[in-house]
Amino acid sequence: MSTVKSIYERLNSSIKRSGTASLVLSGGSSPIKIFEELSSIDLPWSKVQVTLVDDRLVEADNKDSNQNLILNYFLKSKAKAAQFFPLTEDLITKSNFFKTPFDVVLLGMGEDGHFASLFPNMIDDFDAFNSDAKFKIFKTESQGNPFLPRITMNLSLILNSEMIVLLVKGKSKLKVLDEAINNNKLPIHYLLKNRKENFLIEKINE
């Protein structure tokens, strides 16, 4: 089954069961093709809540904004009707309730093994990387490339989902993924260590 079809079926099943569904997306170039395919699928999109797993703390129309990426490549065509929630520290606690557990979380991975905005220099942070930590969305100092301050979900909140899809694109990233199973210096190690049954990895060997 294709990744897009798996995401569609999970969202559609949740809508039929509870009347709404939640979809958490990542930025970067890896998911763009999936965004475009998914946005054209017939689904009651007005019943789908969409947010980001992380973002850079820049204006929404900035080229480095993940929100800008989502608006340009996903929230168009049929998916334009979806309910979009910018990522904020109080997203899962404020009154305009965002559905949890999340139905689908779509993640990418960097060449340093980071996912979301959880980077190697943060591994010793209990709140960021421990699966038993309290659910949290928090701001970070400047990280990554581009070197900018960020906002991100922590690992325990990401794991609070019915399905996680990890996209890994390119030979160098695939090598990092293979190493991460036994290398606890790589952030992605902690995601892989805690993966559950509905954890999909799409490897794109380019």
Question: What are the functions of these language-model segments?
Answer:
Residues 1-23:
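N-terminal glycine-/serine-/threonine-rich phosphate-binding loop
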Residues 7, 28, 70, 170:
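Residue-level signal for inorganic ion chemistry
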Residues 17-38:
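Glycine-rich N-terminal segment of FAD-binding domains in flavoprotein oxidoreductases
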Residues 25-30, 107-111, 169:
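Glycine-rich beta-strand-to-loop/alpha-helix junction loops that act as flexible
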Residues 45-106:
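Ligand-binding beta-strand-loop-alpha-helix segment within the catalytic cores
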Residues 92-95, 152-162:
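The conserved catalytic core of RNA pseudouridine synthases
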Residues 107, 111-155:
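Class I SAM-dependent methyltransferase SAM-binding "motif I" and its flanking Rossmann-like core
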Residues 156, 160-206:
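ATP/nucleoside-binding phosphotransfer catalytic cores, i.e., glycine-rich phosphate-binding loops
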